[in-house]
Amino acid sequence: KFMEAAQSSFISSSYWTEGVGPTAAVATLAKLKSVNVPSHLASISDRFRTGLGDLAKTQGLTIRFYGHPAITVLTFDHPQASALQTLFTVRMLEEGILVSSGFYASLSHHEKHIDRFLEAADKVLPEVSQAAKTGDILKRIPNGVKHTGFSRLT
């Protein structure tokens, strides 16, 4: 009953929270004019891709990178790529870094953040490489391989 009443009524929200969106847009445009954001994103993303790719190569692994500098997607070039990604995520969490198969570069990222990430990856990748070579990846993952895709629980 109440939902039907709301459905048929006209409510203007011009002076409610909808002022937040345009205000944020104006602030974003001002920031984009004052800072070369695309250049920063390209630099940070390149440092991330190059650094992680080089570390992986030293361990005999290949990581492929895709996407725009602001949205880097990474995947291990291996038949059990999802399992390797899961192991990498678990071990990086133990180093205090939450990682997934994507890196979303932002203006807030600086060299020190990439340095910290690469320092942790340098500790973790030897085990990931060993697991890939010995084939015991699944034994090293405490709660199973990550789920891919999206599905409703109901």
Pin down the residues of each PLM region.
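Conserved N-terminal phosphate-binding loop of PLP-dependent enzymes in the Aspartate aminotransferase
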Residues: 1-154
